[in-house]
C-alpha cells in the first residue's frame, strides 16, 4: 500500500507534545497580547487542529502584520525556486508564542556599545563582529606516570 500525501504527512514527531504537557492549552497562551510589528515563533500545537499552519512553518520566526480576535497574521520568508518569498499566514493564537529575537539583539547592541565606550576611553579600536570559535591552542600532553628508561642493557640470546 502506498503512503499518503496528506496535509499533515510525516508530522508524527514534529507535532507531538512533550511528556506531561498533553491536554488543554494553558490560559496564559490566550491572554498574551500581540501587537503589529512584533516577532513571534510559530510552534504548532498538535492538540489544537483549527488554525494550524503547514508543517514547513513549524519553528519559523515571523513578524505580526494583523491581529484578529482569535488569530494572528504573520509574515514569514520562505525559499521558493532559489529566492525568498514573503508568505502571509493567519495562525490561531494556540500555535504562536512571543519570540526572543529582539531581546537577544538588544543585549548584543548594549554589549557592543559598552565595548566601544571602553575602547574609546582606552584609545583603542574595538571590533564588534561576531567571530566563529577559534581552534584551541596547542597543549603538550603528559602521562600520569613518568616513564623511566632502563639503565642497564644486556644482550638477549
From Swiss-Prot:
SUPFAM superfamilies hit by this protein: Translation proteins SH3-like domain (SSF50104)
Which keywords belong to this entry?
Ribonucleoprotein, Ribosomal protein
The stretch of residues making up the signal peptide is none
Q: Which PROSITE patterns match?
A: RIBOSOMAL_L21E (PS01171)
Query: Gene behind this chain?
Result: RPL21
Q: Which family does it belong to?
A: Belongs to the eukaryotic ribosomal protein eL21 family.
InterPro entries attached to this UniProt entry: Ribosomal_eL21, Ribosomal_eL21_CS, Ribosomal_eL21_sf, Translation_prot_SH3-like_sf
Record Pfam families:
Ribosomal_L21e
Alphabetical GO biological process terms: translation
- How is this protein named in the record? Large ribosomal subunit protein eL21
